């Protein structure tokens, strides 16, 4: 069990690192390529890669599962959610820094929590509410220098925030639908179907020929984005299979900090290619509060449960005392 937990930690960290680096690479490609085209290539590469892996393992999804309309509807909802999330997230990167986009993305777990209560009839814990409030407070701190602009003017920066919030919101529909689909299919099978369907849906919107205009560096970044999608989500699925979902979710919340770390590091090494995040001390602190809130929402109940259990064990009198 310890070995499985160790592997689960490494896989979850792999996902957080992949997702942390992703928007930095995408920002380079967005200088030439529009969001729908980038997302098209990401889904195409991920679909081919995951399809090949499942074919070798003889684990391609059985289509007989979708003979019932209910499962087809759920698949359509999940596809629309992932489609919208990828497009809106890429669009937000046109106006925001990679770190800002990832910090806003932490709203997704809060939305998933609310949706799980109303749609899946799950119980909301007090630690989840506290974590959500911490996260929202962290967002205010992170955007402290831009709050007036965001709420009073419809600037490019405001559009970036709107797209980012939209991406986090539509992701919830994907998350809820996938949670139900997992009763019939394994996570890699669901992802393969979603990648394939999203690739087909994006083809009319994409401009595949633009790839010829990319520099060697930008082409490398685009390939990295495609592989990142395959590895990031694949590692997440394997982590969930080997470790408890709450702990995996807690590690995934570190994603914005990896983005912040990579952005600072790359801007120092190659300032001509990578812009340094324009954050004051309160902004940096806000990023940490956002992550802490998301993490507390994911595992806060386990922390308090462990403390109560420890207190109970310690307070029990022994025989003869």
Swiss-Prot record:
Coiled-coil stretches: none
Pfam family membership, one: EamA
Membrane-topology descriptor: Multi-pass membrane protein
Membrane topology (Cytoplasmic): 1-5, 57-70, 121-130, 178-190, 238-249, 300-321
Bilayer-crossing regions: 6-26, 36-56, 71-91, 100-120, 131-151, 157-177, 191-211, 217-237, 250-270, 279-299
UniProt keyword Cell inner membrane present: yes
Span of domain EamA: 17-144, 169-292
Chain ranges on the Periplasmic side, renumbered to this chain: 27-35, 92-99, 152-156, 212-216, 271-278
UniProt cross-references to PANTHER family, sorted A to Z: ACYL-MALONYL CONDENSING ENZYME-RELATED, DMT FAMILY TRANSPORTER
Similarity remark: Belongs to the EamA transporter family.
Predominant subcellular localization, coarse grouping: membrane
Consequence of gene loss (knockout): No visible effect on bacterial persistence.
Any GO CC annotation of this UniProt entry: plasma membrane
Keywords for the protein's UniProt record, in alphabetical order: Cell inner membrane, Cell membrane, Membrane, Repeat, Transmembrane, Transmembrane helix, Transport
Name listed for the protein in its UniProt record: Uncharacterized inner membrane transporter YhbE
Location in or out of the cell: Cell inner membrane
Keyword Cell membrane: yes
